[in-house]
C-alpha cells in the first residue's frame, strides 16, 4: 500500500506543490462561479473530526466535499469513542479504513501527528493550537488574487504569536516573503520557535506601527484563542495597543490589504472602519477557504490533476 500524503503543517508541501494547488484553486473556483459541476471525488468520503468547534472550517470542508461529488461525515469527540479514551492510533486505523480523506480540528498538534502516522488515507490539519495551514493557504491565495505573487512582499502580523502567526512564519520561509510580527511584551515569538523558521524572513517589532510600515498585507486574529479563555481579562489589557486601526493601515503601503481569519471582534483586535473598509478582503478570504480546500483534497486524494 502506498503511504498517504498528509497536510499537517504548511511546510509539508513544496513550492511546486503550492504552485499546483493555487493553479487548481483558480480553475476550480472558476467552475464554481460558472455553476459548472465538477465531481472528481465522486463516491469518496471525507471524515471531519472536531474537538474544537467551528463555523468556517466545517462549512468549507463539508460543502467543498459535496461540491466535488463526495460526501462528508461529521464527528465530534464528545459523541464518539475518541472522547471516551479510545487511543488515537486505534481510531485512525478504523476511520481511515472507512474513508478516503480525514480532516481533524483539535487542540494538540501531537494528536493529529499520531493519527496521521496510523492512517491509511490523507489527513488534513483543520486547526491545532500550533498551526492553521488551511487558513494561511486561503490567505495567500486571496493575496495572489488581489495583488499578485506574494514572493518578496511583506506581511505585518499584529497581535498574539499564535497558530496563525506560526504558520505565517513557515509560509514565509518556504515561499520567500517577509513577516513583521508585533506582539505585546510577554507574547513574543519564542526564540527557539523563531529559529525553526529561519531568521531571513522574520523580524519582530515592539511597536505595531513600525511593523506595519511598508507592509503589503496587514493581518491579525482574536486576542483570546480557544483554550485561553481563563486569560481573557488579562489579555484585553495587554493587547489594548495592538488593535489594527486606520493609522496602522496608513503606515502600510497605499495598496495594502487587510485580512482576518474570523470571527472578528470589532473594537478589540481591529476597528470596524478597517475590517469593513475598502482595504479589507476578509469576505473573499473566508470564501477562499472553500476553494483552496477543494484543490487540496483533490491533490491529496488523486495527485496532480490537469485541466
UniProtKB/Swiss-Prot annotation:
The record's listing under Gene3D superfamilies reads: Aspartate/ornithine carbamoyltransferase
- Indicate which residues the UniProt annotation says bind L-ornithine: 163, 221, 225-226
The record's catalysed reaction(s) read:
carbamoyl phosphate + L-ornithine = L-citrulline + phosphate + H(+)
Q: Which gene encodes it?
A: argF
What EC designation does it have?
2.1.3.3
Q: Which GO terms describe its molecular function?
A: amino acid binding; ornithine carbamoyltransferase activity
Functional pathway: Amino-acid biosynthesis; L-arginine biosynthesis; L-arginine from L-ornithine and carbamoyl phosphate: step 1/3
Which Pfam families does the UniProt entry name for this protein?
OTCace (PF00185), OTCace_N (PF02729)
Biological function = Reversibly catalyzes the transfer of the carbamoyl group from carbamoyl phosphate (CP) to the N(epsilon) atom of ornithine (ORN) to produce L-citrulline.
GO-annotated biological processes? arginine biosynthetic process via ornithine; citrulline biosynthetic process; L-arginine biosynthetic process
Q: Which GO terms describe its cellular component?
A: cytoplasm
Per the UniProt record, the source organism is Aromatoleum aromaticum (strain DSM 19018 / LMG 30748 / EbN1)
Q: What is the lineage of its organism?
A: Bacteria, Pseudomonadati, Pseudomonadota, Betaproteobacteria, Rhodocyclales
What keywords does the record list, in alphabetical order? Amino-acid biosynthesis, Arginine biosynthesis, Cytoplasm, Transferase
Q: Which family does it belong to?
A: Belongs to the aspartate/ornithine carbamoyltransferase superfamily. OTCase family.
Has the keyword Transferase been applied to this entry?
Answer: yes
Q: Is Manganese found in the keyword set?
A: no
Subcellular location, record wording: Cytoplasm
Instruction: Spell out the protein name for this chain.
Output: Ornithine carbamoyltransferase
**Record-listed carbamoyl phosphate binding positions:** 54-57, 81, 105, 132-135, 261-262, 289
